[in-house]
Amino acid sequence: MAIFPRLENYSEVAIDTETTGLDWFRNDKPFGVAIALPNGYSEYYDIRKDLAAYQWLRDSVHKIRRAVNHNMKFDIHMLRKIDVHVNTRTAECTQIRAALINEHLMSYSLDSLAKKYLKAEKVDDIYEELAKLFGGPATRKAQAPNFHRAPESMMRRYAKVDAELALQLWQWQEEEIARQDLHEVWRLEMRLQPHVIESERVGIRVDEELAHKRIGDLTKIVDQTRKEINRLAGFEVNPNPSGSIKRLFEPYKEGDQWYAKDGTPIGTTDAGQPSLGADALKAIKHPAAGLILKCRKMIKTRDTFISGHVLGNIVDGYVHPNINQTKGETGGDDSGTEGTGTGRLSYTRPALQQIPSRDKEVAALVRPIFLPDEGQQWTYGDLDQHEFRIFAHYANPKSLIDAYTENPDLDMHQIVADMTGMPRSAPASGGANAKQINLAMVFNMGGGELASQMSLPYTWETATFKGESEARRFKKAGEEALAVMEKYYRAIPGVREVARQASSLAKSRGYVKTMYGRKIRFPGGMFTYKASGLVYQGTAADFNKRNICEIAEYIESECPHYRFLLNIHDEYSMSMVDEGDITVRHLKEMKRLVENKGLRVPIRIDFGGLAPNWWEATKMDAVTK
């Protein structure tokens, strides 16, 4: 006879679902639940057959003090479908914790982590057993849809071990988080988790009719662009990587360097052949090069994003993006990872961050597809030069800090332009400019790449770098670019020192830390020259997460009929009711919460007026000045 423990009596409980598939937002649902307790007890319950077990779970799970599992949000979504509710504010995910402990793993599956840290394994022979029963390859991907058809005894053996390993992994992680002093960043991820889960659950409304129309619009653009490419070439060109592109640009070699026929230096593949990838096409002056890039972009937007990611995932007028807080396993499969190592949120299904905010042509086609909740309006705010302001905080040059103190709304590129005498943005003919060198400093661009992007002289060199067995080619800045960089360092003291200090720390101890204590590691001492830039980016990502929490918690408390929608790059979007001055007052309070960071330089954001869709919201004038 089944035992039903009092789950609220335990400090933590591992709870794992067995489901008919992975699409909780469609028709898949749980058919079995396994638990594991700190006292060593574990059990599996087939809730299709055992009504008492289901009723016990429905009445008990919400009382669990701390529910733990691997990819916990998946189980939370699945259990909610059968009216079993997990407390999302206390639930803990071993997958998120694993990425805080080490962001460089090749796999974040439970099996992989159990082998690495616990010297234990899941029950893998279930795939062979299922293949014998139902046919098909003996892989997780092929056999997962057959789990609900498997004998209960087989599922019990498999599911209990999963719950037991998740609990053991959580217990090991408790000590490791303390050892690495990761408590602050883990608290941030815990605070964020309920908002991620709620955003996924409700989803984002989509204009399906407009999405289909956009496919037709993009097809016309692609066809027109291809015709123009073919006219310029004098023959038919396949815009995808192909021999016809090589024929069009006729690369030739002088010494060790490849050039396009217009004289543009281009890279070399590992096989020693000319590289005509995106970087080369951006540099080549022939008008067909830019059109090929445009054609590829439009094909990707049409086929991959709108047809695949959006229309392929609509359920009842909504898409339910998978939001990655950290790195994790890909789509519930064990075959790879997704997410970022710096902590920045990423979205899949659809990959919303792939809609380029600065590419107005694509944004104008795609963003109108996304709508606020029925009867509401979309509002949008974008942090002003967020990473550059964090960069200024760390570098702490007096001249820059004083300029921001005098006018918090200053444009950093213009500040640097005034200090160095450079133009703010790149002249049409190329050359040194403040915006490009700021980008280089924040993102640790090499001097040669900076020279290339500013159309200043550089050379190709070959060297073998630490930790690498084979030599590789790199761009080396010429004297003119080096002089520009030196001028920048003199005008803004502290920048070079912070970069050197971060690189030194990365080399000596193997990691650097963000303001929230997130560790960014450098295995084998590789790429330590990127350390300072990764600190800026990681700190910006942590602040973005804090901002989501501040906004979402304010909405829950003060205006629960509004809803936080998404965070892409440094943007925040909400679905709101137009209540005139009341809405503006709420937006001003959200602005205050976001800007209150206590840095040496002010953080700035303004929210715009309400609009019928995402794209129109980005064009609205600010109402929170």
Swiss-Prot record:
Pfam families: DNA_pol_A (PF00476), DNA_pol_A_exo1 (PF01612). Gene3D superfamilies: 3.30.70.370, 5' to 3' exonuclease, C-terminal subdomain, Ribonuclease H-like superfamily/Ribonuclease H, Taq DNA Polymerase, Chain T, domain 4. Residues 324-345 are annotated as: Disordered. Belongs to the DNA polymerase type-A family. DpoZ subfamily. NCBIfam families: phage_DpoZ_1. DNA polymerase that preferentially incorporates the non-canonical base aminoadenine/dZTP instead of adenine into the synthesized DNA. More efficient in using dZTP instead of dATP as a substrate. In addition to this preference for dZTP, the phage also encodes a dATP triphosphohydrolase that removes dATP and its precursor dADP from the nucleotide pool of the host. This is DNA polymerase DpoZ.
